[in-house]
A protein has these predicted regions:
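Long, contiguous binding/interaction regions
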Residues: 1-49, 53-91
């Protein structure tokens, strides 16, 4: 049985604290910026941005695999939410 070659995807995952979860890093940065002359900043949030390439048979398979990575390891689903951006890798 013939099987297509896997596709390569550029993956970007943004992991942020869920709404209502205290963000002490964000609060510290927000308080410090005015002292450095940067006023008008509010709602500062700190998170993680992960970028990698992934081989998968299809975009759906890649998205499912990345979501599983987020749920099991890359994010703490109790306090963090993840957003996945998936694109075919540039040659």
């Amino acid at each position: 049985m013939w099987k297509a070659d896997p596709m390569v995807f550029d993956v970007q995952v943004e992991v942020m604290l869920r709404e209502g979860i205290s963000d002490p890093q964000g609060a510290t940065i927000e308080r410090a910026l005015p002292a450095l002359g940067f006023g008008g900043v509010s709602d500062m949030a700190v998170g993680k941005n992960l970028r990698f390439q992934l081989e998968a048979d299809s975009e759906d398979a890649a998205r499912t695999q990345v979501q599983d990575m987020c749920d099991r390891f890359l994010a703490n689903p109790v306090i963090e939410a993840s957003r996945i951006n998936l694109m075919p890798a540039s040659a």
